[in-house]
């Protein structure tokens, strides 16, 4: 790796790293082709889940020679290389350009040609993934010959499969942990905090694109009580005092304050989690701890009912909440409280994520959902709530002027004080406008039986993916 200045970085491709199925060794041409394919700035048709994060960071990638790829930065800061090239968040594996050129786009969609210690055998959506070990792998030859990842949405079924050794590792609700520990089960080497939160989607408040400056076409559906329109009545300047902005603020405040976080932790999480109040931030982050008194939310159903009455909803309203196909006991508890205290009736959207995702990519979603993401607050996680990932990338159904401002600072500054100030400003904004309330925070990790499996090494991560299971090449059967 060679960094000339903050405008570009040259990377040398590791030699003798073969692609699966005989598609030759990886070189700079593969790297450049892949990154330019997933980057919305170089490929407007990209719908890559992670490529959308590159907006405002990576301009393009070019070939210097067969062994050297050059990354041209739009912005560069201390986190840039770590965030872009590691799998701490989601990671971006390099796929084979030769496979794409020879077999075509449709073939490579069904036949993942990568360089990892396992190669794909079969992927059946919402059912299973099968992978075989790569012998004599350049980095680490796995101890096991095959790994099967099964889609099992029911918690009780996953637990039964672990107890009967139908499965060797899996993700279980935290309330089951102690009883599993008592039976001798343990947690995988790495764990992380998981946050259950609510993104008040539909609040598309940016007027122009963060990068191009083009005017955005957005449907700000103020028929949804939680959605406000700062341009209501015309105009091009953000106005937080329009009727819908003030009414929706009261609605969001009311919903945020009718969440019995402590009871949810005790009853659903078995007291192993803790109350959580604000999206994007972990409770153990120093910035949260310095501002916890200001940003914490009371449990105040009576005050919330008064706010709804002021907003024009004394008899409540209906709202939709996307929760996907997984466990949603926590969300059900919140919905029950909203119904009994505020007469707010929740309809849960349980469709598969792959079917629902296009609505957040297209910025048409206006129903609340869990949102994303969290991690080091000096990193620019604001990409999820502004237009830097549009078109083509993920978003949480909100595009916010303060998110745009904080993102631009974090994406280019290396001044700790400036980075911290940008983080505080963003969180204060979310708190003031009640846009991203938290519910609970809990530790999360894969669970396995150490009498059957040895699993001593695992790369760290920020977000739960595949139930916290990764680094399968280090699993050994006893």
PLM regions with names:
Residues 448-478:
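Long beta-strand-rich cores associated with HINT superfamily self-processing modules
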Residues 4-47, 60-62, 106-112, 117-268, ...:
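Extracytoplasmic/periplasmic ligand-capture domains
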Residues 20, 79-82, 265, 276, ...:
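Short catalytic/ligand-binding loop motif for oxyanion handling, primarily in non-cytosolic enzymes
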Residues 439:
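Active-site-proximal polar cores
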Residues 83-85, 279-280, 381-383, 450-454:
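Short aromatic-enriched loop/helix-cap "lid" or pocket-rim segments at secondary-structure transitions
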Residues 12, 47-99, 451:
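Surface-exposed binding/hinge segments that line
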Residues 270-293, 445-452:
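Mature extracytoplasmic/periplasmic domains
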Residues 14, 73-74, 134, 442:
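Surface loops and adjacent helix of pleckstrin homology
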